[in-house]
UniProtKB/Swiss-Prot annotation:
It comes from the Viruses. This is Putative transmembrane protein ORF175. One of its GO terms (cellular component) is membrane. Its main location: host cell. It comes from Acidianus two-tailed virus (ATV). The keyword Membrane applies. It is a multi-pass membrane protein. The keyword Kinase does not apply. Keywords: Host membrane, Membrane, Transmembrane, Transmembrane helix.
Amino acid sequence: MLQTWAKLAYEANLGIVYGSTLIILLLPLIGSFMPPNLVSSISKLNAFTLLESYLLPVLSNFGIFGGLALGVGSAIAFSVLNSIASSFLNLSFNQQQALTIVVALLVSQFIFGGWATFALFLTSMLGSVPPVPGLAVIMSFITPFIDGLIATLGGLMVVLSILYELSEIGLVTLP
């Protein structure tokens, strides 16, 4: 039963990770179409706020090339980390792939925001509803709840995704 839920969480989480990573990589390009406060909010969603508060503005000066540089840099970093881990741990090819996905899931949550980026876009869309008497008050209560719910579910799905990957390579047995 847990195996089935973990697989569903894994597949959903990969979609969110790829989507939010794509948003961040294209942020220098689409930043001109978004309000500046939304762009700055996205860049402050993760653990590396200090790095990205300097990195994203510099990359945005180069437009799409800045996004590509960030993507290529991330890919090189994943490749180097994977080869180092594989040589130390003496892993098979399938285990290397699983380790890469686990590392990518974790790193994407911190560097690219992952579920936090999704929550920000959802709550900003809810916040941009045309002002209707009484609706603004309701939205001010609902938006933080939705944000917290998405963050909690996102964290749970990341854990389930990692458990699923570890079970696929035989390190963990799920019921």
